[in-house]
Amino acid sequence: MHAAPCGAPGPRPRFELADVAHLCGDELVRAGRLTAEQRKVLRAISRCRTAELGGHLDVCEDCGYERPAYNSCRDRHCPKCQALAQHRWLQRRRERILPVHHFHVVFTLPAELRPLVKANSERLYALLFATGPASLLELAADPARLGGEIGVTAVLHTWRRDLGFHPHLHCVVTGGGLDGRGQWHATRPRFLFPVRVLGKLFRGKLLDALRRLYARGKLVLPGSLGDADAFDELLDRLYHKSWLVYCKPPFGGADAVYAYLGRYTHRIGISNSRLLDVSKRAVVFRTRSPRTATLPPRVFLARFVDHVLPPRFVRIRHYGLLASGNVNGRLAQARRALGPSRVAEPAPAPEAGHDDARDQPDHLRLYRELTGIDLRLCPRCHARAMSPRPLPRAKQPRAPP
């Protein structure tokens, strides 16, 4: 675990998701409606960067200034633990971004399917990944449209700004593809595929897959859907409904894609900075500026845990040219076909001073790159003399069975 300083410089949100978890997390657990993973996430968020997880004491060897630094929970649902993970992920991905324009495509599941998704989250999220990108790849392979293999990075989001349940898939799609002869075919500058055609293809693939899962007895059917006729009627209605697929105009080349991925890949349902007030009566949070929402704490927390992913579920996936099996083959071939180009460069790190920043431990170096703050500098005397000393982990009462 990495430790974050309690007194690190920089703005700190007045309220945190952990405050809501402390207020009513136990009450929600006692109600017995949480999965083991949801309970684990609430516990991690409640303990993140507290003495319960242990840590160390940064002590200035020159003036004696002390600053406790407690360990992070590193849970992917924790709003305090995403920045370093996101930065590391982007550094690994940046060299794979092709120097072409890209499109942003969003596949959204109809509201009628949300109860079924909640009851079968792992299967249905996987189905969304299996059908959305496959629809893009199929249209791209059609010689009448593009006649090549595109690259797709897909990211699962499950929320609206008010924390309502709204599963959808964000896809970053290359504005062109590689054909079987190694030639690159670019799309038109502001047009990928007809969204109505894409929506129909996505709808057909997903509903056909749902029928197959149902026939094999692989679905948990909530409420009235347990009746075979009700399930068939639902799918029939959805076959005759237009499905929402959104395709945004393209953003620029590699630099723009790099910046965009930085905003979307490790986003969670809500950030601490959006919390405006937390009390026993209500949680007030920002939705879309200047709009806000107000919910009872228990309702707010219940909405948040709806977005806890199944254990080990991969929420960022790559397809086509960007699939892991194509990195050294088709992707490299596409790069050669496109010719020499500049790959997106990360923002330069702050000057390292007398000691090279590369000599710092990884988390200290990344923290410095992201914030410009050197945690080895003493806030009081400004000597580069902060050194860590162990802190004991706080004792906890034994949890109930």
Model-based region annotation:
Residues M1-P401:
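Beta->alpha loop/short-helix hinge microenvironment recognizer with preference
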